[in-house]
């Protein structure tokens, strides 16, 4: 499989050896801007600063289960555009231009509520918050509704935190959770290896 390096370390000539640096990576699921996102993610810690750069996970099945009925009704059968122009650090990817109109966001279109084929449970499928857009809604309505959903879905009661030690390996179901990374001291070293399992099932509501 392809191995990606996630690191803030630079080589002797000042070139980063990996991606994402030392800043915060906001809540997201990996590569949901693709029609078939990865079904699982794997992270392996080679070097990590003590109790910094923690990774947090939010359970989207629990978040949907406890979602107020009024919000469940509002998002029923809604389709969300998942932004492909920016990475999880909020940086614009090469080949894209910045836009202030979420309705013009490039990326895959997925149901806001999907079903886990193994458990048959419904779950929120949010991707990432910035630049997302709910099809068919006025922009301000889409923004307000997404803000409400995200505020609910990322409550601490739905989350779990991985405090990394060197040698830790973590695997998760990419479509079932959101994850984010804390920023950490840029003078420390953090080197992670990441790979993913290819998605093989069309996302269903």
Each model region followed by its residue ranges:
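Fe(II)/2-oxoglutarate oxygenase catalytic core
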Residues: 1-171, 175-205
């Amino acid at each position: 499989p392809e191995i990606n390096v996630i690191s803030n370390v630079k080589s002797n000539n000042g070139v980063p050896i990996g991606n994402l640096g030392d800043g915060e990576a906001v809540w997201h699921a990996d590569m949901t801007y693709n029609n078939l996102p990865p079904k699982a993610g794997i992270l392996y810690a080679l070097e990590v600063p003590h109790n910094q750069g923690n990774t947090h996970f939010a359970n989207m099945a629990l978040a949907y289960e406890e979602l107020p009925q009024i919000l469940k009704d509002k998002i029923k059968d809604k389709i969300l555009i998942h932004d492909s122009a920016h990475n999880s650090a909020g940086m614009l990817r090469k080949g894209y231009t910045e836009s202030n109109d979420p309705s013009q966001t490039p990326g895959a279109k997925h149901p806001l509520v999907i079903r886990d084929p193994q458990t048959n449970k419904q779950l929120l499928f949010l991707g990432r918050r910035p630049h997302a857009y709910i099809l068919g809604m006025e922009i301000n309505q889409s923004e307000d509704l997404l803000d409400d959903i995200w505020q609910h879905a990322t409550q601490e009661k739905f989350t779990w935190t991985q405090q990394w030690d060197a040698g830790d390996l973590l695997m998760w179901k990419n479509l079932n959770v959101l994850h984010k990374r804390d920023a950490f001291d840029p003078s420390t070293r953090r080197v992670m290896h990441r790979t993913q399992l290819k998605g093989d099932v069309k996302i269903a509501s």
